[in-house]
Amino acid sequence: GLMSVLKKAGKHVAKNVAVSLMDSLKCKISGGC
């Protein structure tokens, strides 16, 4: 149903946000921004 679609989309978005946050953290830590 719609709820499962929304949950899947939410997980996908959350994963992308987490990945980009990790990338920016690594960038700041390594000083390569």
From Swiss-Prot:
Statement: the UniProt record of this protein carries the keyword Transcription: no
GO terms for biological process, alphabetical: defense response to bacterium
Tissue spec: Expressed by the skin glands.
GO CC aspect terms: extracellular region
Localisation: Secreted
Keywords recorded for this protein, A-Z: Amphibian defense peptide, Antibiotic, Antimicrobial, Disulfide bond, Secreted
Disulfides per UniProt: C27-C33
Similarity comment text for this entry: Belongs to the frog skin active peptide (FSAP) family. Brevinin subfamily.
Protein name: Brevinin 2AV
Source organism per UniProt: Rana arvalis (Moor frog)
